[in-house]
Amino acid sequence: MKFKTFFIRLVIPLFFLFLFSNNGFAQGSKDSVLLNDSHFHLTNYVQEGTDIHKFLEIMGNKVGRVALFGIPLQQMWNYNNSGNFAPTYYLASDDPLYYYSFTDAYIAMAYKSLTKEQQARFDPMITGFNPADMYATDHIKRVLTTFPGVFTGIGEFSIHKEFVSSKVAGPVATLNNPALDRILDFCAESGLLVILHNDINMPFPKSGQENWDIEQIKALFARHRNTPIIWAHCGVGRIVRPIKDQMAMLDKALASPQSSNIYIDISWTEVAKYVTETPEATANTAAVINKYPDRFLMGTDEVAPSDQKSYLKILDMYKPLFDKLTPEAKQKLLKGNYERLFDAARVKVRAWEKAHINDPKKIPPPTPSSGIEKN
């Protein structure tokens, strides 16, 4: 009898608690959340990665929400070059990268395989477009109308990126290409949040060399003041180091009312190395984040992690920075700014989809090769 009472009072409630919890993320566990991850790749450069259900287990109770995307580029495997060695990363082969549009359908279907409660923890992003192509905007619209209710933004996509840009097949993407302007104009119209990667400088610049990247990205931001843009990694790369007085430059830029739509993510362990390289670098970074607490987001930039420890290692790396932040700045960096920006984008994008989902499909005009005569 005592065992029966014990079973009813303890075991059965525990069973239902487990049954209705969301992959270990019960309602009462929100206080344990350390991070809303604004920058995460579910798949790698050969479109392989972590199963999304497994990734929910990796997130556990420590990560609340995640901006979810793949990699827009596929690394080519050229047998005549590497033989049976199948490269899985862009630094592992001399062969080109090419844009892989199916990544958006893959991310959408992974998201749609989840329950509504699980879906609420993700903000899928569109990445499978070529930013040098005037048709890129048409691809983005097509993805939204094919998968309504799924996507929140676009990115991470790259314009100038060390090693990568020169490997992409076809015309190189540039900051002054009208195709990019067309993309960002549509994001302003639809409410899509943008995650843009553009290096702040070229690799191994010579002393006194002109930094043309800075002026071009300033001009881009000025042309698109109605588009919410997250500048990934603050322009820093694996070998693209922070430029001289970068924090002072960033301070000046963020102070301008004309840049109120620009946000910075400090994702990637390579960026964390630079920020924590010296006490001075850490203090300077903390000072700017404390001054503009609404403008920074935290992401991991991990690619297809296999366990929680490797997924969240960046949080330990950034501890010296976190220790110098005010409570308000730390909360907004780690969680609050994500919720504000992505929640707003969700509402706007759903409204755009509702207004345009039944738009008539345009019939393209006949071309000389089609053999169809104009009426």
Task: Give residue spans per PLM region.
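An N-terminally biased module of ancient metal coordination in phosphate/nucleic-acid-related enzymes
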Residues: 26-109
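Active-site gating/metal-coordination segments in enzymes
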Residues: 28-33, 82-202
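Hydrophobic faces of well-ordered beta-strands that scaffold small-molecule active sites
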Residues: 36-40, 66-69, 122-126, 153-155, ...
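Bacterial N-terminal signal peptides
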Residues: 10-22
